[in-house]
Design a protein with these regions (language model features):
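FAD-binding core of flavoproteins
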Residues: 1-61, 65, 69, 186, ...
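Alpha-helical transition-metal enzyme core signature, strongest for iron centers
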Residues: 57, 61-64, 91-101, 105, ...
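Glycine-rich phosphate/cofactor-binding loops in nucleotide/flavin-utilizing enzymes
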Residues: 147-192
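Conserved catalytic-core motifs characterized by acidic clusters
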Residues: 31-45, 71-84, 142, 157
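A generic structural signal for well-ordered coil/turn residues at beta-strand boundaries
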Residues: 15-19, 46, 83, 121, ...
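Oxyanion-binding "anion nests"
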Residues: 53-82, 86-98
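C-terminal helix-coil-helix/basic helical segment that borders enzyme active sites and/or dimer interfaces
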Residues: 68, 72-79, 95-128, 141-146, ...
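A glycine-biased, small/acidic residue-tolerant capping/turn segment at secondary-structure junctions
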Residues: 110, 133-159
Length: 192
């Protein structure tokens, strides 16, 4: 590697590769400073959050597909699990959460495509992603039973990735706090 750069690789929670990078007197070139640097970092944060939201929508969609497929094929008491109304209602709730997440993710992506990097739009999307991902992930694992957590079955991998996304660049609480702090006209807020 480069002089003064130490890299220590590791595996992340969702089985991806990560690395700790330590810069010790490494040669550097300043790309920006002051407000310009702050704006560049803010924009990268928004772009990354929006990309993670889109990735999460895909992971939630696949977790739901696997769950519905499992309910249609797994038999218990001589019938498929899909014949139990309570389970199909839970799968329908998962679908609603997925579509809420997809809608806000698409809105955040569209806002960026129009040339606006809005941290409030990104936080709205990330908050819904965190909430939907947690519920969809928990339901997918629960409806699959023990097989859902095995390394051989893919739904657990999607849930692990959703968990990692939920904690990257702020969890649900951090984004809810950002949104609450952005309110300037409390008369417009309806509680109750």
């Amino acid at each position: 590697g480069a002089a003064g750069v130490m890299r220590t690789p590791f595996r992340t929670h969702d089985r991806r590769r990560g690395a700790q990078i330590v810069l010790a007197s490494a040669p550097a070139t300043r790309l920006a400073s002051g407000d310009r640097a702050g704006e560049a970092l803010r924009r990268v944060d928004i772009l990354t959050q929006t990309a993670l939201c889109a990735e999460a929508v895909g992971a939630m969609e696949r977790a739901l597909e696997l769950t519905v497929e499992y309910l249609k094929t797994r038999k218990q008491f001589g019938v498929t699990l899909a014949t139990f109304e309570a389970l199909t209602h839970r799968a329908a709730d998962m679908y609603v959460l997925l579509e809420l997440a997809r809608s806000l993710s698409s809105y955040a992506t569209g806002t960026l495509a129009e040339g606006t990097a809005d941290e409030i739009v990104a936080s709205r999307a990330k908050l819904q992603i965190c909430r939907s991902a947690r519920q969809i992930g928990q339901e997918a694992i629960q409806m699959h039973g023990g097989i859902g957590m095995t390394a051989e079955y893919p739904v657990g991998h999607y849930v692990s990735r959703l968990t990692a996304i939920g904690h990257t660049l702020g969890d649900a609480d951090a984004h809810l706090s950002r949104l609450a702090n952005s309110i300037t006209d409390w008369d417009m807020v309806s509680i109750g």
